[in-house]
């Protein structure tokens, strides 16, 4: 659970305009939410989905931001926020029979990954 996005122990980068459907990315994000930083990297490296590459880059960016900006060791990080939002839809038309045109929608996504220092009770 993320305490606050402005907390000194939280780093939340955003990967915008990823040319992939949000539903395909959501399937990957559900697997890493709540896992440790190192475990989420291992999961993403071995999952067979194309959505793993942009999510892996976002997780690595979150870890680098936490280490550089907040001074938190990467071994102490937990993926506390993993969400995907709809980006703009690119609309194209495909020529069809008898002069018709069918609409093709190319979806984009915005990925937010939040990592925070692990809280031990």
Curated annotation (Swiss-Prot):
It comes from the Eukaryota. It holds the Pfam family Ribosomal_L22. PROSITE patterns: RIBOSOMAL_L22. GO terms for biological process: translation. InterPro entries: Ribosomal_uL22, Ribosomal_uL22_bac/chlpt-type, Ribosomal_uL22_bac/org-type, Ribosomal_uL22_CS, Ribosomal_uL22_sf. It is found in: Plastid, Chloroplast. The keyword RNA-binding applies. CDD domains: Ribosomal_L22. SUPFAM superfamilies: Ribosomal protein L22. GO terms for molecular function: rRNA binding; structural constituent of ribosome. GO terms for cellular component: chloroplast; large ribosomal subunit. Belongs to the universal ribosomal protein uL22 family. PANTHER family: CHLOROPLAST 50S RIBOSOMAL PROTEIN L22-RELATED (PTHR13501), LARGE RIBOSOMAL SUBUNIT PROTEIN UL22M (PTHR13501:SF10). This is Large ribosomal subunit protein uL22c. It comes from Guillardia theta. The lineage of its organism: Eukaryota, Cryptophyceae, Pyrenomonadales, Geminigeraceae, Guillardia. The gene is rpl22.
